Amino acid sequence: MLKKLKIKLQYLLPQHALTRLAGWAANKKAGWLTQQVIKIFASYYRVNIKEAQYTEFSAYSSFNEFFIRSLRSDVRPIAAGDNILVQPADGTISESGRIDKDKILQAKGHDYSLEALLAGQSLLAKEFENGQFVTTYLAPGDYHRVHMPCDGVLREMIYVPGSLFSVNAFFAENVPYLFARNERVICIFNTAFGTMAQILVGAMIVGSIETLWSGPVDSQRKGIIQRWVYPDEGSEAPIILKKGEEMGLFKLGSTVINLFVSNKIKLASHLQNGSITRLGEILGEAPH
């Protein structure tokens, strides 16, 4: 009964209005009250503030400043090697493995199609058929900046409006086509491992999704799909990002999905469902 009620509430709640309210509140600078909220949040979610660039709670004047805190440069070493890809974020592996032609596993008993995830871009979807995928869930207490698994040249970015269902394990197991329904920002890169997609999926009370090159992508939330195409390497002003470099962030949590083309990489064996991962750890490698 409680399970059904939790699911029903997700459909009934005014998702976008609640998200706007949460974003507004998280940006407020309320002095002592803000400090108390940050301390309670950090204690409840066991945030290791000693890893942050600024280790005093008083350094953060709003909740969002704390939530998108930067880490010290020495706490997340980036695995070396030209053939090595690294985990793009702190989080928990929700699912990973082979894409079954065009189907991606969401949770036991649930899958969704590449074309649905990629906003109907059928030619783009075909590039990833029978490839590999990794879905990483960022819990509220995790570090919420997202980095590059490998060197890449940005090819295009697509903003897809959508629902804002919660994306934790419970809802992944109970809301069909969750990641293909939720608001998301799709970033496509050309890499030494072929085309790579890094998709930042929104959720309930995710105030904003931002990228390094564009700032808040979803700030206007016009309700239409928007697409941007970027210069190739060798052209004027390409956007080139290095392995381990920051590429985006979430203001209040969510999920990162990585897609890789077929026969280019082998995912690391430790990527088991429910396993805790850290930015910079080995995600996979190119077979020799």
Curated annotation (Swiss-Prot):
Protein name: Phosphatidylserine decarboxylase proenzyme
Keywords of this entry: Cell membrane, Decarboxylase, Lipid biosynthesis, Lipid metabolism, Lyase, Membrane, Phospholipid biosynthesis, Phospholipid metabolism, Pyruvate, Zymogen
PANTHER family: PHOSPHATIDYLSERINE DECARBOXYLASE, PHOSPHATIDYLSERINE DECARBOXYLASE PROENZYME, MITOCHONDRIAL
Compartmental location: Cell membrane
Cofactor(s) needed for function: pyruvate
Pyruvic acid (Ser): residues bearing it: S254
A GO MF label: phosphatidylserine decarboxylase activity
Annotated HAMAP family: PS_decarb_PSD_B_type1 (MF_00662)
Reaction equation(s) it catalyzes: a 1,2-diacyl-sn-glycero-3-phospho-L-serine + H(+) = a 1,2-diacyl-sn-glycero-3-phosphoethanolamine + CO2
Cofactor note: Binds 1 pyruvoyl group covalently per subunit.
Site (Cleavage (non-hydrolytic)): G253, S254
Matching NCBIfam families: PS_decarb (TIGR00163)
CC per GO annotation: plasma membrane
EC code: 4.1.1.65
